[in-house]
UniProtKB/Swiss-Prot annotation:
Gene Ontology annotations for the cellular component aspect, listed alphabetically: cytoplasm
Keyword S-adenosyl-L-methionine set for record: yes
HAMAP family, alphabetized: PIMT (MF_00090)
Organism: Salinibacter ruber (strain DSM 13855 / M31)
Active site as annotated: S68
CDD domains, alphabetized: AdoMet_MTases
Name used for this protein in its record: Protein-L-isoaspartate O-methyltransferase
GO MF annotation: an example: protein-L-isoaspartate (D-aspartate) O-methyltransferase activity
Intracellular or extracellular location(s): Cytoplasm
Amino acid sequence: MTATPSDDRKYRHQRERLVETLRERGIHDERVLSAVGAVARHAFVDPALRDRAYADEALPIGLNQTISQPFTVAYQTALLGVQPDDRILEVGTGSGFQAAVLCEMGARVYSIERHDDLLRRARSVLDGLGYDVRTRHGDGTRGWPAFAPYDGIVVTAGAPEIPAPLLHQLREPSGEDDGPGGRLVIPIGGREGQTMTRVRRTGSGPHDYEQEEFHSFRFVPLVDEDEGGG
């Protein structure tokens, strides 16, 4: 079940309060705030939880997965530095909420999810709301080479280390005056917690990357199918 115009009116003030909460928590990118505020988050959660849809909290979506806390979505999106028409790969479609936010920012979004049931559900909601997201069922640690290179890659699950295929699929800088190339935002660490990390591609060589670390978060684990994840 997707949102309706009457739903939008019902939840409008809750969305506005959520945006103010994110601003108070340190999200200052107005484009990101506008995008989060434009997405009908209640459409991505179970109907029984819709009264909590605009609280700044993660909510269960089944299969031991969650729809990310809005602050986390806004934080990662701000670090990614999304520009209109950027080609963005999302690893971990989940509910589809992050993909919708990226679409609101004008990105071309490609999203991978390893749980087929979640992907079908997210696909239905995204289509119902009119978001143009290309999706794929598969192992996100391998990226999606067919549509690479990407201006940005966002990983919505915690990883013990950065998957090399994702680095290789970042766009190279196009010239000396154009600054760094593609950006990867990924939480790195064990199951007990991760450090939000941003990697920028700075050249065409195997070591031409710059890495920055930011705040601590706690995500569900990113599973590599070669390691026996189920």
